[in-house]
């Protein structure tokens, strides 16, 4: 890491995070002037107004220009989506347990007196709440499932970066002008053209700013850098980039502009090493210094950490630690099935090793063709302990997409959005992460409904659980589709849509079915606890008959809080096998019930003509979802978290080592889980020391690939280090750990999430 990158990294975290009202005020000012116009045009005009008037800055020593807010890591509001939680939490932002922000008293006044009164009863949240049935609301209130993205932009998408970089804005504007001429009444084309032209003007604002700063700069080197930024910006406003610097700059400008359009999570980066490779090679051919090109890439990696999301307190529990979702996958396959690893794949990991920040959320695609040098570079990066990169298995993901009707060429081009959500770059609107389904809560409901049922059998209970899962899935689908329609009718994204195939051909926004592939991704959570509970219940009640069903239910209701309850809990934990230890009897329960969940989910269609697709990952939702479930037959206390990750074993229950964990997960139908899965594994640092440690990890990754799991990620850290960080956070400000599908600064997490990470089993190889 160069001195410049070190200083940029330090400066990014030097000040307290604040809330900025600027976007909200500009958006509202435009909206007041466009009453009665079509929603998509109002949205486009509001975004264009922001791009014209928002304050811009180029910070000291930056090589890549473009900041969403003048102050680093500021949160921005979207009252047009949901003004109510913002009003409720204005006074809590600086002191809440998770994701704190400072906000001035004047900004609180402006929000209460100007912004909220305008957006009350005008927001997307009003529409969604008005459409939700009482039954759906009751299920979400008890957290049987959650409906996400009701208060913010949807995001969770990868635009067609090759289209942006290989054509340039000037050519794209000309193409959109032709569409407008051919279909002058099409509001989508009008909105997209308006925003493409506004993007050009916004980039030119940076050119002018850089020139002004250069004119007043006394440092010769910095003046030259500013003039180069100005030159690159003027070029990018009209022409396609030629060099790596130009390509990185246009790439980042568009990221910032799309943030203004929707203020959404997970506008992800796709296959960065593939589409950026020609520009990197051109710069090398032109004689650019390889060390400087690496510094450019490190600059871009630092910039990815400038964007944080302002979430509600509730949402921050589900998505703790600012998971922005700047996710990129490296390596993988070409469209003809050959290895896609290239020199930039290695450089992306090298640059990450230098900066070691939570973003970008890098991943590596592994397959039977992956070569040893790249696998060792991957293992080396994992050993740094930040949880990056995560690993995805082409041997599972490509067939998963083929089963969903994706072409072979497109399936081989897959990438990931957000945490682990599988997507086809530039061709998919997957509505990933639209809902989370609490499988353990469903079991709890079934247990209590059977109190006093002397005729209950284990098979009968299983059938009731399946039926109840099916019933609540119908309600989850209903709520998800209402949210889907809400985004269509209230929050179209015409600029983003102009970079998604087949929106231009159809003349429709992604929210209106314009994309080639249309999915709705929903997550089943708690499968490890569910299978552990049913296996123990079957043994204790129906096979060994040590307790009647009602007696066990009474112990659970009391939360094991009696001497007899403590003995029962000890037996439930210690005498019955647990998922994650390669025990067929319990693993098969997981496989059967998760398959049932998946097959039920995939029956349903969304308003865009696509289908629901199942996944299993938690982000940090295993903590709040566990808080609403009482004590369970796996020995879990009432309110205790669920198993982390999605497919991970329950904390402390994976006693047979990491290979046994892999074998348990391999018994699940990983191919069915086409919205993504998540497996957390924690290693002690000592087990990965030296060349031998790296080779053991590389061998473990090959075993993961051969066993056909879909995903795995790692924490490499001692629990003692994490406990010290809890006690002395000021000494561990830079400590990055893996949460679930993303990494975060440990000291920025709430204590409940910190404790969860500490308690995860630390394995040795």
UniProtKB/Swiss-Prot annotation:
Its EC number is 4.2.1.-. The keyword Ligase does not apply. One of its GO terms (molecular function) is lyase activity. Residues 3-637 form the PFL domain. GO terms for cellular component: cytosol. Keywords: Lyase, Organic radical. The keyword Lyase applies. The modification Glycine radical is found at residue 741. Residues 645-765 form the Glycine radical domain. Belongs to the glycyl radical enzyme (GRE) family. PANTHER family: DEHYDRATASE PFLD-RELATED, FORMATE ACETYLTRANSFERASE 3-RELATED. Probably shows dehydratase activity. Contains a dehydratase motif that is predictive of enzyme function. This is Probable dehydratase PflD. It comes from Escherichia coli (strain K12).
């Amino acid at each position: 890491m160069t001195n410049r990158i070190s200083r940029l990294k330090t400066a990014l975290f030097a000040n307290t995070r604040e809330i900025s009202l600027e976007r909200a005020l500009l958006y509202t000012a435009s909206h007041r002037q466009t009453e009665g116009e079509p929603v998509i045009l109002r949205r486009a005009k509001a975004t264009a107004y922001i791009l014209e008037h928002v304050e811009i800055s180029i910070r000291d020593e930056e090589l890549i220009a473009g900041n969403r807010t003048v102050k680093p890591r500021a949160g921005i509001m979207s009252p047009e989506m949901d003004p109510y939680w913002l009003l409720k939490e204005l006074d809590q932002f600086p002191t809440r347990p998770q994701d704190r922000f400072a906000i001035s008293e004047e900004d609180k006044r402006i929000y209460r007196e100007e912004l909220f009164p305008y957006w009350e009863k005008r927001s997307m949240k009003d529409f969604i709440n008005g459409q939700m049935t009482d039954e759906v609301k009751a299920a979400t209130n008890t957290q049987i499932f959650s409906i996400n993205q009701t208060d913010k932009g949807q995001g969770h998408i990868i635009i067609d970066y090759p289209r942006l970089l290989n054509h340039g804005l000037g050519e794209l504007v000309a193409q959109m002008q032709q569409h407008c001429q051919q279909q002058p009444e099409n509001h989508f084309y009008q909105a997209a053209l308006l925003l493409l032209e506004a993007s050009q003007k916004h980039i030119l604002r940076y050119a002018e700013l850089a020139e002004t700063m250069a004119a007043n700069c006394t440092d010769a080197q910095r003046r030259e850098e500013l003039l180069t930024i100005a030159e690159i910006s003027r070029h990018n406003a009209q022409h396609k980039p030629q060099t790596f610097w130009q390509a990185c700059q246009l790439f980042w400008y568009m990221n910032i502009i799309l943030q203004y359009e929707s203020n959404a999570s997970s506008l992800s980066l796709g296959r960065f090493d593939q589409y950026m490779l020609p520009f990197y090679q051109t710069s090398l051919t032109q004689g650019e210094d390889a060390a400087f090109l690496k510094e450019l890439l490190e600059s871009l990696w630092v910039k990815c950490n400038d964007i944080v999301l302002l979430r509600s307190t509730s949402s921050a529990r589900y998505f703790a630690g600012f998971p922005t979702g700047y996710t990129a996958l490296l390596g993988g396959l070409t469209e003809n099935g050959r290895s896609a690893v290239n020199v930039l794949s290695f450089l992306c990991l090298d640059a990450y090793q230098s900066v070691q920040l939570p973003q970008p959320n890098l991943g590596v695609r592994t397959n039977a063709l992956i070569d040893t040098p790249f696998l060792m570079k991957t293992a080396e990066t994992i050993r740094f302990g930040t949880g990056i990169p995560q690993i995805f298995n082409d041997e599972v993901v490509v067939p998963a997409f083929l089963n969903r009707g994706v072409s072979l060429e497109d399936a081989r081009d897959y990438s990931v959005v957000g945490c682990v959500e599988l997507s086809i770059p530039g061709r998919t609107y997957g509505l990933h992460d639209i809902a989370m389904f609490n499988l353990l809560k469903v079991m709890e409901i079934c247990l209590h409904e059977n109190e006093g049922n002397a005729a209950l059998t284990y098979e009968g209970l299983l059938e009731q659980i399946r039926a109840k899962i099916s019933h609540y899935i119908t309600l989850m689908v209903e709520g998800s589709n209402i949210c889907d329609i809400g985004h269509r009718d209230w929050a179209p994204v015409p600029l983003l849509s102009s970079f998604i195939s087949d929106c231009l051909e159809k003349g429709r926004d992604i929210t209106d079915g314009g994309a080639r592939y249309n999915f709705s991704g929903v997550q089943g959570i708690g499968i490890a606890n569910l299978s552990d509970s049913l296996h123990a219940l079957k043994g204790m009640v129906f096979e060994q008959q040590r307790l009647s069903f009602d007696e066990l239910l009474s112990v659970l209701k009391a939360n094991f809080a009696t001497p007899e309850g403590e003995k029962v809990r000890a037996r439930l934990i210690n005498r019955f096998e647990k998922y994650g230890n390669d025990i067929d009897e319990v693993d098969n329960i997981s496989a059967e019930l998760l398959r049932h969940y998946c097959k039920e989910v995939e029956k349903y269609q969304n308003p865009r003509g696509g289908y629901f697709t199942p996944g299993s990952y938690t982000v940090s939702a295993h903590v709040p979802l566990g808080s609403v479930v009482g004590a369970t037959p796996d020995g879990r206390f009432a309110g205790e978290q669920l198993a982390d990750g999605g497919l991970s074993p329950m904390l402390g229950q994976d006693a047979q080592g990491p290979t046994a964990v892999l074998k348990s997960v391999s018994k699940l139908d990983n191919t069915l889980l086409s919205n993504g899965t998540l497996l957390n594994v924690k290693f002690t640092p000592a087990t990965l020391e030296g060349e031998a440690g790296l080779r053991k990890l590389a061998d473990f990754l090959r075993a993961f690939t051969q066993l056909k799991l879909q995903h795995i990620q790692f924490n490499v850290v001692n629990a003692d280090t994490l406990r010290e960080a809890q006690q002395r956070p000021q000494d561990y400000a830079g400590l990055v750990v893996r949460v679930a599908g993303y990494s975060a600064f440990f000291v920025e997490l709430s204590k409940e999430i910190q404790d969860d990470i500490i308690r995860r089993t630390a394995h040795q190889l």
